[in-house]
Regions:
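Amphipathic alpha-helical segments that form the core helices of the histone-fold
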Residues: 20-29, 111-122
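Long, low-complexity interaction regions most often at the N-terminus
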Residues: 10, 16, 28-31
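Surface-exposed, Lys/Arg-rich phosphate-binding patches that contact polyanionic backbones
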Residues: 101
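Generic structural signal for well-ordered, non-membrane alpha-helices
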Residues: 15, 22, 92-93, 113
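Active-site catalytic microenvironments for nucleophilic, acid-base chemistry
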Residues: 5, 9, 23, 97
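Intrinsic disorder/low-complexity detector
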Residues: 1-4, 35-97, 124-152
């Protein structure tokens, strides 16, 4: 989502996208399995907003009498929470990199708003595509190939 938005909305070149991805990998290496609260605070101080992850609870999902169905729902909830926690972390990394690259508070907020709309377009009830569509367009249009995550 971040690279796609930078390419599509801000005309980042292949070189600038590759540099962004390199910096992102450095952040991930530096903060992997560590707290990143310092980054959250820096982002908030700069923009007056932060990327938050609100955990799903059992109240957000239907309850089934069947133990198998209920176990399936609980696993779905666990996976959704894990994905959302990583997404909050990764968006925070990306926004902090853009601050380093000179994005002002208003420009960064505009970028965040566009990213939220794009996420809604691929995950919401009225979705118009998938993350794979964006991934393919980024690979063919910008020449940036982003490895897909390996899922255990």
């Amino acid at each position: 989502i971040l690279c796609y938005g930078l390419w599509k909305d801000y005309r980042y070149s292949q070189r600038k996208l590759a540099d962004f991805c390199r910096k992102f990998a450095e952040y991930d290496e530096r903060y992997f399995n560590k707290t990143y609260q310092k980054l959250v605070d820096e982002l908030y101080n700069y923009t007056d907003w932060k990327v938050e992850h609100v955990k799903y609870t059992k109240d957000d999902y239907p309850h089934y009498k069947s133990k198998i169905m209920q176990a399936s729902v609980e696993e779905q909830m666990r996976c959704a929470n894990e994905i959302n926690a990583l997404s909050a972390r990764y968006f925070t990394y990306g926004f902090c990199i853009l601050i380093e690259d000179g994005f002002g508070s208003k420009k960064l907020t505009n970028f965040k708003d566009k990213a939220q709309k794009r996420i809604q377009s691929i995950t919401g009830d009225m979705r118009t595509g998938t993350i794979n569509d964006l991934w393919k367009e980024l690979a063919t249009g910008a020449g940036i190939y982003i490895e897909k995550p390996k899922i255990d």
